[in-house]
């Protein structure tokens, strides 16, 4: 009887941790989609700008700023139903 109870409680712990992982990854994906869709953060422009800036210092900052500005202007037009969370 004690062995069965132990196995049962171990099973509950495993299923509980699986559901926590699933909900965490779901919320992470949702926030990631929000950032990609809405350009809520200037990460893309800054990343590209920094890569270019590694080759041409100064130009990378300008390219990053331009990409962010273009993204902020075009995203509401191209994805009107997408909102930043």
From Swiss-Prot:
Enumerate the InterPro entries for this protein: HssA/B-related
- Specify the superkingdom: Eukaryota
Pfam short name (any one): Coiled
Family assignment?
Belongs to the hssA/B family.
Cross-referenced PANTHER family: HSSA/B-LIKE PROTEIN 17-RELATED, HSSA_B-LIKE PROTEIN 17-RELATED
Identify this protein by name.
Answer: HssA/B-like protein 59
* Species whose genome carries this gene: Dictyostelium discoideum
């Amino acid at each position: 009887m004690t062995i069965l109870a132990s196995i049962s409680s171990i099973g509950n712990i495993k299923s509980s941790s699986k559901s926590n992982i699933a909900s965490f990854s779901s919320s992470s994906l949702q926030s990631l989609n929000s950032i990609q869709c809405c350009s809520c953060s200037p990460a893309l422009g800054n990343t590209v700008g920094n890569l270019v800036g590694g080759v041409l210092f100064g130009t990378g900052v300008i390219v990053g700023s331009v990409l962010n500005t273009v993204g902020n202007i075009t995203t509401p037009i191209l994805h009107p139903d997408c909102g930043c969370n």
